Amino acid sequence: MAVIYYDKDCDLSLIEKKIIGIVGYGAQGHAHAQNLRDSGLKVIVACVEGGRGWKKATADGFEVMCVAEMAKKADIIMMLAPDTSQAKIYKDSVEQGLTPGKMLMFAHGFNIHYGQIVPPSFVDVTMIAPKCPGYMLRQVFTEGAGAPSLIAVEQDASGKAKEIALAYAKGIGSNRAGVLETTFAEETETDLFGEQAVLCGGTTSLVKAGFETLVEAGYQPEVAYFECLHELKLIVDLMYQGGIAYMRDSISDTAKYGDFTRGPRVINEETYETMGEILGEIQDGSFAKEWILENQAGRPVYNSLRRMESEHLIEEVGAELRSMMSWLKKKK
């Protein structure tokens, strides 16, 4: 079972005199910066000068500067820019500011695990990865609670990398919920697999396959949309709240019997084999290489697939039906 750290394991005093630099002020960046500041810590923010993040961080009262200047000043540098831009930011602006005793920190292990960023041996390299969106990390903190995080240590030059990272986790409030120990490899590989096989790739492909099956059989696209996409949230919310068993206790016996007997025919042995292949491509680095080259080439495949998917009938039908849902309009 995993090792989980709580408040008694986290000593905020270890970083009270340190300067924490946050690279990026987007979904995660704003939450980290504000939570750390509210915990009494010194925080500076680095963004593209004049950009949206720069303006927002300035309006929120932070000292904002370019990444190179921040890298020289900060003792702990948290990389919260998009994964695809981190390697360039590091090479152009962060690397030259690193000196012995500093810590380079990440919220996702991709660039370290796949060698896109190779820090010098004299700095600590750690990860604190909150398991929730940035807005939720901030919200639960202000309510006096916290969101769970993962912690990993890739490089311990100081001999206190884990302790310092745990102090950071306390600064963002994760000590209140629990900080689960992992590795850069495990976090990266499981995160990518979850996205590709289940959360994003698996779910969207399953939804579209169900929708297309009903439409091709002559059913109205609008009804197919309701049954295969719209109602998905109802089921996922139940699973999120209490797990699979809780969800099954909340649905009809007819639905439950169909789940038990038909579900394994949809996700069958062939599906397991394909999932194994997808995991293998993540583990051996071939997916990472493919994605890195795709970005270097200007994303031709990505852009083509994105355009093609946006033209699927399910998008047209969904837009029409969602326009009928007043509660969705209120959220925009």
UniProtKB/Swiss-Prot annotation:
What does UniProt list as catalytic?
A: H108
> Which residues are Mg(2+) 2-binding?
D191, E227, E231
Which Gene Ontology BP terms does the record give? isoleucine biosynthetic process; L-valine biosynthetic process
Gene Ontology molecular function, alphabetical: ketol-acid reductoisomerase activity; magnesium ion binding; NADP binding
- State its cofactor: Mg(2+)
Which residues belong to any copy of the KARI C-terminal knotted domain?
Answer: 183-328
Locate the residues binding Mg(2+) 1. Answer: D191, E195
Q: What does this protein do?
A: Involved in the biosynthesis of branched-chain amino acids (BCAA). Catalyzes an alkyl-migration followed by a ketol-acid reduction of (S)-2-acetolactate (S2AL) to yield (R)-2,3-dihydroxy-isovalerate. In the isomerase reaction, S2AL is rearranged via a Mg-dependent methyl migration to produce 3-hydroxy-3-methyl-2-ketobutyrate (HMKB). In the reductase reaction, this 2-ketoacid undergoes a metal-dependent reduction by NADPH to yield (R)-2,3-dihydroxy-isovalerate.
Name the chain's protein: Ketol-acid reductoisomerase (NADP(+))
| Keyword list, A-Z | Amino-acid biosynthesis, Branched-chain amino acid biosynthesis, Magnesium, Metal-binding, NADP, Oxidoreductase
Residues given in the record as substrate binding sites: S252
Organism name: Dehalococcoides mccartyi (strain ATCC BAA-2266 / KCTC 15142 / 195)
